[in-house]
Every structure is written in C-alpha cells, then in structure tokens.
Amino acid sequence: MAITKLSNIGTPQGGGAAHLKNCISYILNSDKTEGLVGGNAGTTPQEVYQVMMDTKQEWEKENGRQGYHFVISFPPGEATKEEAYAVINDFCEEYLGENFDYVFSIHTDQKHMHGHIVFNSVNRMDGYKYRYEKGDWEKYIQPITDRVCEKYGLPPLVYDPHNKIGKSYAAHYAEKE
C-alpha cells in the first residue's frame, strides 16, 4: 500500500531557484539511488536543473513556485526496488506525461523502499503553472498510485478520511529529535 506525499518547492527569500536545485540534488544523490533514476529531464542534477530553468525562461515564468516534490513510499518489505521503479515510472507517465519536465529516483537507503519525484512548476507545452487544488490527492493523485500498484501486484492504500491514524509533520519531526 504505497502512499503518495506532496510538497511544493518555493522560491527562497531573495528570489532564485536554489530550493529547486537543492531538491534535485538530494533526490539524485548516488549514495541513496543505486542508479535507479528516470524521467524526461535528464539524469544529472545539473542537466535536470538546466532543463527546468530553460522551460521557465522560455515561458517567462521564473518567479514564484519553482516545482513540486512527490514521495511515493512503500511499507518495509512490500516492494522491491525494481517494482518501486516501475510504479513511479508509470505514475509519472500517467500523471505528468510530456507536459512537465520531471526526474524521479528510487532511494534504497532506508528500510522502506521509496521514490522521489521532482517536477517543474511550468508546463512545457503551454506555459501554464501547475495547480494543485484541495482534494486532488484523494481524487486524482493517490488513485493513480493505487491503480499502478495493483498493476504490479501490490496492494492499494486503504484510506478512510474519517479515521486518520497518521502523524502530523510536527509530531513525526519531534520523534526524530
């Protein structure tokens, strides 16, 4: 039962795209990925960053939100790195297609297999910025993850919006310290 988590990559104080560059570098850290990298924007941090910045410049959309970072996580022992790669590759192809520059990687450095996706905030086909609306996770994003997981014989997420058992980010972070 993979779960998809979402976050945006904003512009740092003073402008620029340092957060985007740092996020790309983090997800492509070779100490974590074992070379399990894919996407349509390149395979090195420099190449991916340049492709995304070129798209922003082409459409004159260099300000504001720079990109998005999704994480798809599997419980320990549920998915192999090859299955995780296939799930995340298919998720990206279905959800992002060729509309957005993206890169993804599988991190194998934890007990649980998980993949990171970073995609550009600017649609490379029409120049519009990606918009996440309240409810998109439940209506579109997690159902794609579930459908792709089932395609590979992995269970879907059992989600009850009235019985939230997860921890808030603050609670999770406090436990780590």
Model-predicted regions and their roles:
Residues 1-177:
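N-terminal nicking endonuclease/strand-transfer module with a His-rich metal-binding environment
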